Amino acid sequence: AAAKYKEIIENEDTYGYILEPDIRTLTKEPEANYSKEIVFGEFHNKTKNYFSGPKSELPEESGGWCDYMVELEFFKSMPEGIRKDAWFLTKVTMTGQERNPETGRYPLLNWDDPATNQKHPYWKKNIESSDWVFNYDDGYYETKGISSASGKTRMIFRYADILLLYAEAVAYGTKSIDDLAFDCMWRVQERAGVPLISKDVTKEYFQKAVFNA
């Protein structure tokens, strides 16, 4: 496995894969639809009725269906940073309440606020559509009234996975950690906005770090 991953990584220009510089690009439609980071994904075309359903990953207070939620311990264990901010929906738009007369916006509460009915945060990375767009500048969802139709490609396997799978294969299948494995870890960690692993760590520490990356 390590040999095949290494071949892909060392020839990423030939294969055409990239690690998007800004992880938030992967959460946006249409930017993410044809991202070269996606190795395998479900492409959707809402104009042809082959669309994904962003309502499945939204809380009920926002008009969602509450089908997919984030496992709570996984959420708590992920290091704070740009990746966590991009991946998880931690704010609930209370669409059933009155809008703010000055901003025209619905109240926005933390997912664990007692006023919500939520016990888990939600995934943010799959829900953007033309009707439901996250404004990163002020941390707010701009909604025209959400639709179940989205043309966003759902990511199943990304180039980031290949980088980490190589690091994992080296960590568990060889006697020592090579420079490429460290480089793969650093690329993923740097983009995630978390501290980079030191080359002085033990093999056991590296194994755990790959699992948590």
Identify the residue ranges that each predicted region occupies.
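Short coil/turn linking the two alpha-helices of tandem helical-hairpin repeats
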Residues: 1, 172-175
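Elongated scaffold/linker segments in the mid-to-C-terminal portions of large proteins
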Residues: 7-163, 172
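Conserved catalytic neighborhood of penicillin-recognizing serine enzymes
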Residues: 185-213
